[in-house]
Amino acid sequence: MQQKCYYEILNISKTASGVEIKRAYRKLAMKYHPDRNPGDKEAEIKFKEISEAYEILSDDSKRSRYDQFGHAGVNQQSGFGGTGGFEDIFDTFFGGGTSRGSNRSRASRGSDLEYTLEITLEEAFFGVEKEITIPRMESCDSCDGTGSKSRSKTTCHACHGQGTIRRQQGFFAFEQTCPVCNGTGYSITDPCDACYGNGKVKKQKTLKVKIPEGVDNGDRIRLQGEGDSGSNGAMNGDLYVQIIIKEHKIFERRDINLYCEMPISFTKACLGGDIKVPTLDGEVVLKVVPETQTGKVFRLREKGMKSLRGHRRGDLLCKVVVETPVNLSAEQKELLEKFADSLGEDYQSKHAPKSKTWFDNVKDYAKKFFE
C-alpha cells in the first residue's frame, strides 16, 4: 500500500517552516488525540499518521532525507533498512562489503517507540514527574534472548551466517536480506515456547518521566535506551514522549505568553479600582484605571510560561470585557435613567469618545452618497 505524503497529512506546503509544521501538528493532534475520541479507530489511525509525519518533518536531517528519497529514506521498515540513509540505499542497489552487510544483519538496534502524554497547563507551568506504562519488546528470559530452548543456534545454510545473499541482475549486483533466516545468519531447530523463536517478548514497562517547566504542545522528551530491545547485543531503541497540553478554562497559551479575558463591572470600569486576577501561581491585584473601555489589555509581566531555552518568563495579558448589568430592579432602572439624563445632550462628545468617533465616521461615509 502506498504511504501518504507527510506534507499532505499535516496539510502544509513542502516549503513550510519549522514553526508552521509545529502549529499544524498541534492543531491536528488536539483534534484526533485518542483521549478526545475514545473508541474511534479512524481517529487513532489518523493520530498515528500525524505523529509519524511530525517526527520526520520536525527533524531537519530526517526531513532532508525524506525530501530526497521519500519514505524509503526514513522508513526503518523499508527495503533499505536501519538508519544508514543514503549509504544503505546505494549499497542496496550496487552492492556493499559483505562484512558490512553481515554486521548489520547480526546486530540490530531496537526500534524507537513513541508515547503521547497529555498534561495540564498547570503541570506544564510548574513541571511535573509522571509515571507511564508502555508496551515494549524485551529480551526473552526463558531462552536468554536466543530464541532457542537449548540456547544454541545453527548457522544458516543459505547465507552461511552472513545474513544476506548476493544476487546478480545484468550488470548490477545487489545484496538482500536472506529469506531463510530473515537476516539473522542462523536458524533455530528448537524454538523457545515463550517467544516462539523470536528471542523477544512483549512486556509492560513502567517508567517515570520528568516534564520540565515551560514544555509546550508537540515537544518531545527522549528517554534513551527505553525503546525496544536490540538484537544480538545491539543497543536498545529510544522512547520519545510527545507532550499534549489540555485546553484551559481561563488561559490561552501563545508561545511563552498567556492570554485571558477579564470581565469587570460597569461601575468598576467607570470609577476604576483594584481587582483580583488569577494567575497560574496565585492571585495578583491589578489596578484598573478609571474610564477603562472593553478591549483594553493589561500586561502582568513574568506571569506567563518559562522559556525552555533560557531563564526568561513570558507575560500574562488580560483583556478587559465590561459587563452590562442584567436583571435590574425598577429602582435600579430609574437610577440609570436619571444618570443618563445627567449626562446631557452632548453625551457622545464628552462621555463616549469611541461612540462619537463611530457616528462621525458613519456620517462622513453617508455624505458620499448624498452629496
From Swiss-Prot:
Similarity field: Belongs to the DnaJ family.
- List residues binding Zn(2+) 2: 156, 159, 178, 181
Recall the taxonomic lineage recorded for the source organism: Bacteria, Pseudomonadati, Pseudomonadota, Gammaproteobacteria, Thiotrichales
- Show the domain comment: The J domain is necessary and sufficient to stimulate DnaK ATPase activity. Zinc center 1 plays an important role in the autonomous, DnaK-independent chaperone activity of DnaJ. Zinc center 2 is essential for interaction with DnaK and for DnaJ activity.
The cross-references to Pfam families, in alphabetical order and at most eight, read: DnaJ (PF00226), DnaJ_C (PF01556), DnaJ_CXXCXGXG (PF00684)
Q: How does it assemble?
A: Homodimer.
What is the annotated localization of this protein? Answer: Cytoplasm
Cellular component GO terms, alphabetical: cytoplasm
Report CR-type zinc finger ranges. 127-204
Entry GO MF terms: ATP binding; heat shock protein binding; unfolded protein binding; zinc ion binding
Organism superkingdom:
Bacteria
Note how many cofactor molecules are bound and how. Answer: Binds 2 Zn(2+) ions per monomer.
Residue ranges of domain J in the record: 5-70
Q: What does this protein do?
A: Participates actively in the response to hyperosmotic and heat shock by preventing the aggregation of stress-denatured proteins and by disaggregating proteins, also in an autonomous, DnaK-independent fashion. Unfolded proteins bind initially to DnaJ; upon interaction with the DnaJ-bound protein, DnaK hydrolyzes its bound ATP, resulting in the formation of a stable complex. GrpE releases ADP from DnaK; ATP binding to DnaK triggers the release of the substrate protein, thus completing the reaction cycle.
Q: Which GO terms describe its biological process?
A: chaperone cofactor-dependent protein refolding; DNA replication; protein refolding; response to heat
Which protein is depicted? Chaperone protein DnaJ
Species source reads Francisella tularensis subsp. holarctica (strain LVS)
CXXCXGXG motif repeat ranges are 140-147, 156-163, 178-185, 192-199
Question: What cofactor does this one take?
Answer: Zn(2+)
Keywords recorded for this protein, A-Z: Chaperone, Cytoplasm, DNA replication, Metal-binding, Repeat, Stress response, Zinc, Zinc-finger
